[in-house]
């Protein structure tokens, strides 16, 4: 009986030693190493020396992981890591180009400066003749930035097996989150947003925010801004616009349209506001930061102040020196658009209730008072 048991065990042992994983299983071995090296959490774990005589460990594949574990790994990868993973096999490629992974990267990097207008512009962009992705390298132009080059090269390998290759169109939906991310990252997609202190902080635009079309420059991690024409004045272009000077438009409307204010009746001294202003009727509106102040007839004592009951509202722009014609203006609570060709035209008002919005304006305060 004992002899029979020993023979059975030895037979089973030699049989299992003769088994090996199929060749495709080792394709992703290096990707596991990439993940464990790049993941700072995994670096805190004690490294275990593998037995070189064990072929099972050497041939371990990422595809052998449970679904949940694999999803967690992919969810932690940066865009370049997802592209590397997508090169391994068709199964991983399908996972790595999925919207749920790239939507997170879109939201994290671009979410704060992409508004409804940018999403509409993206839909127009992908349906236009300018959206050509005949080659992943065509997106890079002369970028030369190592991260983007690496990312695009990875994508080139992902789709190189397509015989009828027409860029991503044959394998990746044009409206996918991955396509949007790459078009933004490579600067091919110009999206609408607003820029604080336009034209490099030109004195005539201090504490203002104007609509523009923006393109990302991966060399400098800044943007190029293209402002709409002001009357007969040609479109202005500004380079080197930093992330902190950009915001998504708070009002989803054309800069030529008057904003219908819904907070005029509740304005009181001390409120922070943005007001539309334009030099003349041919120009688009910009948004300007200001404060609501007390009437001249009021001593400023909050216990006796009745300014909030008056039909006249005093607006103050403290970036201008006392006595400047731009320092103060008065509007009516039934205000629509007021002004003239000399002082410009004041349009709609937004009351700022968000502390983050107010703090953003204060961060762009000029170094010195303007005349």
From Swiss-Prot:
Domain named F-box: residues: 59-105
Name of this chain's protein: F-box protein At2g32560
PROSITE patterns hit by this protein: FBOX (PS50181)
Organism: Arabidopsis thaliana
Domain of life: Eukaryota
Pfam families for this protein: F-box-like
């Amino acid at each position: 009986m004992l002899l029979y048991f020993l023979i059975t065990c030895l037979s089973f042992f030699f049989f299992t030693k003769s088994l090996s994983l199929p060749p495709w299983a080792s394709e992703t071995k290096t990707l596991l190493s990439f993940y464990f090296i790049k993941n700072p959490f995994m670096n805190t774990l004690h490294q275990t020396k593998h037995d070189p005589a064990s072929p099972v460990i050497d041939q371990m594949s990422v595809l052998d992981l449970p679904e949940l574990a694999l999803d967690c790994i992919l969810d932690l990868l940066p865009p370049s890591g997802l592209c590397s993973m997508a090169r391994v096999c068709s199964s991983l490629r399908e996972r790595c180009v999925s919207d749920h992974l790239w939507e997170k990267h879109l939201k994290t990097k671009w979410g704060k400066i992409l508004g409804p207008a940018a999403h509409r512009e993206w839909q127009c962009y992908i349906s236009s003749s300018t959206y050509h992705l005949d080659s992943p390298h065509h997106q890079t132009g002369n970028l030369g930035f190592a991260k983007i080059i690496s990312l695009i090269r990875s994508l080139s390998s992902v789709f190189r097996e397509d015989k009828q290759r027409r860029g991503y169109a044959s394998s990746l939906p044009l409206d996918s989150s991955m396509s949007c991310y790459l078009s933004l990252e490579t600067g091919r997609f110009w999206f609408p947003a607003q820029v604080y202190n336009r034209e490099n902080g030109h004195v005539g635009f201090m504490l203002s925010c104007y609509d523009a079309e923006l393109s990302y420059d991966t060399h400098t991690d800044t943007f190029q801004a293209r402002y709409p024409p002001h009357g007969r004045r040609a479109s202005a272009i500004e380079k080197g616009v930093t992330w902190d000077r950009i915001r998504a438009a708070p009002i989803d409307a054309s800069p030529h349209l008057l904003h219908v204010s819904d907070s005029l009746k509740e304005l009181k001294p001390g409120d922070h506001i943005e007001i539309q202003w334009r030099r003349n009727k041919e120009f688009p509106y910009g948004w300007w930061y200001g404060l609501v102040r007390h009437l001249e007839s009021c001593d400023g004592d909050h216990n006796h102040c009745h300014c909030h009951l008056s039909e006249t509202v005093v607006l103050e722009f403290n970036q201008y020196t006392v006595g400047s014609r731009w320092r103060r203006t008065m509007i009516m609570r039934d205000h629509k658009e007021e002004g003239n060709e000399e002082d410009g035209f004041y349009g709609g008002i937004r009351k700022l209730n968000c502390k983050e919005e107010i703090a953003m304006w204060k961060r762009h305060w000029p170094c010195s008072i303007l005349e």
